[in-house]
Amino acid sequence: MTIAWARRRYGVKLGLGYIATAGLLVGVGVTTNDVPSTIVAGIAGLLTLGSINAAETVASIKEIAAQTERVANGNLEQEVTSTRTDEFGSLADSIEQMRQSLRGRLNEMERTRADLEETQAEAETAREEAEQAKQEAQAAEREARELAATYQDTAKRYGETMEAAATGDLTQRVDVDTDHEAMETVGTAFNQMMDDLQATVRTVTTVADEIEAKTERMSETSADIEASAGDTVEAVSKIESQANDQRTELDSAADDVQQVSASAEEIAATIDDLASRSEDVATASDAARDSSKSALDEMSSIETEVDDAVGQVEQLRDQVAEITDIVDVITDIGEQTNMLALNASIEAARAGGNADGDGFSVVADEVKDLAEETQDRANEIAAVVEKVTAQTEDVTASIQQTRTRVESGSETVESTLRDIRTIADSIAEVSNSIDEIQRTTSEQAETVQSTATSVERVAGLSDDTTALASDAESAVIGQRESAEEIAASLEQFQNTAVEQLQSRVASFTVATEDSETAGGSVEQPVMRAGADGGGA
């Protein structure tokens, strides 16, 4: 591949010849070590190389020049070729391509000349036909001017009516009593379009009013949920407060039990102080029994409060279900509004690409966008309601668990009360018999230890009750915040989407349904809904 590439390059071949000559000079100089001989050999080599190269180059140039001269003299069949593969061969190939292109252009010019002669004959025939057509066109022009004048008058009347309709007066209609079927068709289609548009605007007005009314009802329901959540927070706070009180009383009971234990140890250490210690233990036992009774009463009160809280949460869950139904209604209304926008888009497409159709299309797009925004708001409300429902169920479960813990705490307090009564009996036995003091002291110590364990267990349950009540309060507060978010979303929806829809519809004037039914004038406008939902 390298040899073939070098053969196609004249400069490369010449350079290789000079390199070979230089190599020869170096070889002669090294061999003979004679400068004059080296110079003579170099000159001889260069002359020989130049002669060979010049002879070959001159021959190639003469060959190409002769072929090119014959082509220049008009012999386009003469091919221009060369046996060389270097730049001279490329030159011959380029001249050959030019010859072939020139021959093709000449053939094309011959064909074009023949076509021109044929076209000239056809043009003469066409001129005669054009003269006849000119006369017919003049007659048709006169007829067209008369018809255009009639169409212009009718179109002017149509245009005035359509301009009035474009400003929002949907009561405008055109007079279709004309002798021209095309204009009559246009007028009939326009009147039908205005009837459909008027009905659509009237329907959209009704839907907007219904959406506003239902949104107001949802706002009222949301306010009820907030109030209910506030009551629940108050009830749970009360539960937490009572649990704290219970914890305080249990701590007091634990202190009393510790006193009883200390008394028992002193009885075992010294018999002399047995009487006074027995009185202290009896006093502490009475106090512990009173505290246990009080704690039992508090447990009963907490259980009642928890039952009330459960009822309120269940009522809140029912109200959330009602909100879900209302969201479903809003979703249906959004879908119906979207269907109205689709029908309006179809009517706009039927009206064509004129200014009225474009204006109607803009209104249809606005209604469609509003329907989509309504759907998005409904989806957001549904998501919030779903979150509130989940939180309500969590609160219900937590309160149910709290009630179970309270019932368990009540049983524990009753057990503690029974233990304290046992302590009192043990103290009576100590007072009746000094001989049995050691056995009684041992039993009392065991009973006191059991009582301390029970009191500690009840204290732990009280802490759990307090924590659960705090969690329930936080959950209900979160539920109330969710209800407030629902109310804010409803208010934003009412202040933006509904009012925007009513504002859009308020820009149109439509005929009353009573006037259309009675066959009265279509110029009677119906009351339009303003931005505040009233008449405009």
Curated annotation (Swiss-Prot):
Chain intervals for the UniProt region annotation (Disordered): 116-145, 278-307, 512-536
Stretches assigned to the Extracellular side: 30-39
Entry keyword Cell membrane: yes
All ranges on the Cytoplasmic side of the membrane: 2-14, 56-536
Residue ranges of domain HAMP in the record: 55-107, 149-202
Entry's Gene Ontology BP terms: chemotaxis; signal transduction
Top-rank taxon, per record: Archaea
Residues recorded as bearing Glutamate methyl ester (Glu) in the entry: E266, E473
SUPFAM superfamilies noted in UniProt: HAMP domain-like, Methyl-accepting chemotaxis protein (MCP) signaling domain
The protein's name: Sensory rhodopsin I transducer
Organism: Halobacterium salinarum (strain ATCC 700922 / JCM 11081 / NRC-1) (Halobacterium halobium)
